[in-house]
């Protein structure tokens, strides 16, 4: 526990092209070794691919994908009486977006397309259509929470 109190949460600046804080957070999750220009060019290229393939506004497709990827429930391990229980808990809004972005980027990196912008674009479009690995991960997390519903009364 920190002695000097909690550190204030820094708010990210909105993205200059799409004017969206969620897009900035996605760029930050894509970024490796501080190469933000490279991450943003990958994202904008991916959004261009989404625009070409769907004909819709890429930010709207991305927000739809995020709504399909963000988890509502998750399980937390808690030790009670010498045994560990997986207790389902509701996910806080900020953690929901963080997990959604993390899963979207990590499963995009695991795809087999040739370039990262293609991988990211296809993962976002799949997530918007309620398919894809990131949505499957969310379903798995929800299934775990549902399976351990009997332990919900333990509360964190």
Swiss-Prot record:
This is Small ribosomal subunit protein uS7. Belongs to the universal ribosomal protein uS7 family. It comes from the Bacteria. GO terms for biological process: translation. It comes from Lactobacillus gasseri (strain ATCC 33323 / DSM 20243 / BCRC 14619 / CIP 102991 / JCM 1131 / KCTC 3163 / NCIMB 11718 / NCTC 13722 / AM63). Coiled coil: none annotated. The keyword rRNA-binding applies. Part of the 30S ribosomal subunit. Contacts proteins S9 and S11.
């Amino acid at each position: 526990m920190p002695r000097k109190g909690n550190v204030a949460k820094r708010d990210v600046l909105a993205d200059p092209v799409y004017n969206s804080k969620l897009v900035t957070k996605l760029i930050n999750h894509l970024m490796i070794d501080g190469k933000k220009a490279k991450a943003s060019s990958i994202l904008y290229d991916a959004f261009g691919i989404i625009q070409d393939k769907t004909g819709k506004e890429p930010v709207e497709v991305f927000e739809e994908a995020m709504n399909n990827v963000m988890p509502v429930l998750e399980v937390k391990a808690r030790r009670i009486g010498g045994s560990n229980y997986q207790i389902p808990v509701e996910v806080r809004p900020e953690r929901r977006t963080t997990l959604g972005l993390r899963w979207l980027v990590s499963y995009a990196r695991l795809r087999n397309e040739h370039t990262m912008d293609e991988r990211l674009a296809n993962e976002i479009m799949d997530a918007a259509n309620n398919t894809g690995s990131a949505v499957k991960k969310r379903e798995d997390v929800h299934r775990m929470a549902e399976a351990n519903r009997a332990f919900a009364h333990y509360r964190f």
